[in-house]
Amino acid sequence: MPDSNITKRALAAALKELMETKPFSKISVSDICQACDMSRKSFYYHFQDKFDLVNWIYYTECVAVLKEKNFDTGWDLLEDLCLYFYNNQSFYRRTLSVDGQNSFSEYFRDIVATILAVDMEEIFGKDKYLHFYVDFYTDAFLCAIKRWLLDKNCMPAKQFTGLLKNCL
C-alpha cells in the first residue's frame, strides 16, 4: 500500500473514532490530526477539509468496492449500498445529518444522481423531462435512505430495500 494511502487511512480511522463520541460539526482538523499524531500539513496535503475526508472514506470503502462488482439490476446495487450503510450506520448517521456545501449528503446525492441517470435514460430514453425524473428519484431515494438510517430502530438493509422496491 503506498504511503499516501497509509496516511489517508490513519486520518480516516481517527475521524471515525472521534465521531463515536463527538458530533461531526464539533470535530476539527486539528482534532483529527492530534488523534493520529499527524500534522495539519499532512492532512491538507491529502484532503481539502474534513468533508473531503468523509467523501474519501465513502469512496474507498463503498464506491470503489461496488464498482468492482457486476450487478444484474440497479436493485442489487441498491441492496449492497444499503447493506454497507447498515453495517456502518454509526458513522453515516452522523455524516448524513450534516447538510450544506461540501457535505457528504451533497457528495452522495451526486453519486446517486449519476447512477440513476443511466437507469432513467434506459427507461425514458431522451425524454425532454429526463433531468426532472432523475432529480425526483434521486431526492426520493436520498430522503428514504436518510430517514431509514437516522431512525433509532433502523430495520435491516434487505427489509428496507424490499420496501423501497414495493413502493416503485
Segments the model singles out, each with a brief description of its role:
Residues S4, I32-D52, Y84-N87, F91-T95, ...:
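Basic/polar phosphate-binding segments, predominantly the helix-turn-helix DNA-binding elements
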Residues T21-F24, D151:
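Short helix-capping/hinge SLiMs at alpha-helix to coil transitions
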Residues K69, Y92-T95, W148, K152:
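Secondary-structure edge/capping motif, primarily at the C-terminal ends of alpha-helices
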Residues K128-D151, M155-L168:
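Hydrophobic alpha-helical segments that form the core
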